[in-house]
């Protein structure tokens, strides 16, 4: 018997949860939480994504990653988030898709707003990404990223 609470579609777009983005005023301080309190053992080096206005550091978990993001430069979009949430917090969730342009076009056809120019840009994993406006995603900022070669 089919569960009426579950929606079925012909070709699901959503893929694996790649990471949860966490905004922080200090990646160095946030790393201490994941390492010292939660026991994370694989913490990648911090690196800059100036074109997106963020510093990034990935923390590996057994089945996904936490993406720590800190403002980079005066125009960082993270400043606005931290103004409302001074200690930081969950910023976005990121799902993998097979084809970022097809995913973008599908989301637009369904009436969803894509942030920025709407054109995919290269994200922290080196693959194209887009962000879907939280107003269309139940209040959650959703990043869609083209599936990277090789899983982390």
Model-derived regions: residue spans:
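N-terminal beta-strand motif that seeds the catalytic metal site of vicinal oxygen chelate
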Residues: 8-31, 88-95, 146-152
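Short connector loops at helix/strand junctions that flank enzyme active sites
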Residues: 54, 61-63, 85-90
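An N-terminus-focused feature that recognizes amino-terminal "leader" regions
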Residues: 37, 50-53
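Extended macromolecule-engaging scaffold surfaces
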Residues: 18, 40-44, 141
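Vicinal oxygen chelate
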Residues: 8, 12, 24-31, 37, 47, 57-59, 73-76, 81-136, ...
């Amino acid at each position: 018997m089919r569960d009426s609470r579950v929606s079925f579609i012909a070709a699901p777009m959503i893929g694996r949860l790649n990471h949860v983005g966490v905004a922080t005023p200090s990646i160095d301080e946030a790393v201490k939480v994941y390492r010292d309190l939660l026991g994370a053992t694989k913490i990648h080096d911090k690196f800059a994504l100036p074109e997106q206005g963020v510093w990034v550091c990935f923390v590996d978990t057994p089945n996904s990653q936490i993406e720590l993001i800190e403002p980079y430069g005066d125009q960082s979009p993270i400043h606005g988030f931290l103004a409302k949430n001074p200690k930081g917090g969950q910023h976005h969730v990121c799902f993998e898709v097979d084809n970022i342009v097809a995913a973008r076009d599908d989301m637009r056809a369904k009436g969803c707003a894509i942030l920025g120019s709407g054109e995919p840009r290269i994200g922290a994993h080196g693959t194209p990404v887009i962000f879907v406006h939280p107003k269309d995603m139940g209040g959650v900022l959703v990043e869609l990223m083209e599936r990277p070669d090789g899983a982390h």
